[in-house]
Design a protein with these regions (language model features):
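Short, non-transmembrane amphipathic alpha-helical segments
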Residues: 66-68
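Short S/T/G/P-rich N-terminal loop/turn motif that feeds into the first structured element of a domain
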Residues: 1-64, 73-91
Length: 91
């Protein structure tokens, strides 16, 4: 069942996001990722992703590569919420 990841990074910058994304968006690393969007906030940013399953999210966010990329960028650790998805529409 698809799942949604919502990661809020209070105090993070878009430069930090770009730096971490450069490492995290390499082909093959994000197996199961269907959609990704980054939304600027007044004090940080939010990443909204749709994945093939909650397990795919856990595999990604629990990986050494994920933890290392976040730490190397200098951004605060994201507050991550995961929820099941009822319906996905792509156009």
């Amino acid at each position: 069942m698809p799942a949604q990841l919502i990661a809020t990074v209070n105090g993070g910058t878009l430069d930090q996001y770009d730096q971490a994304s450069e490492k995290l968006m390499k082909p093959g690393f994000q197996a199961g990722l269907l959609h990704h969007a980054c939304v600027p906030l007044d004090d940080g940013f939010m990443v909204i992703e749709t994945w093939e399953s909650e397990q795919a999210i856990q595999d990604f966010t629990g990986s050494e590569q994920f933890q290392s990329a976040i730490a190397a960028s200098g951004m605060p650790m994201p507050d991550i919420q995961v929820r099941p998805v009822h319906n996905v529409v792509s156009k």
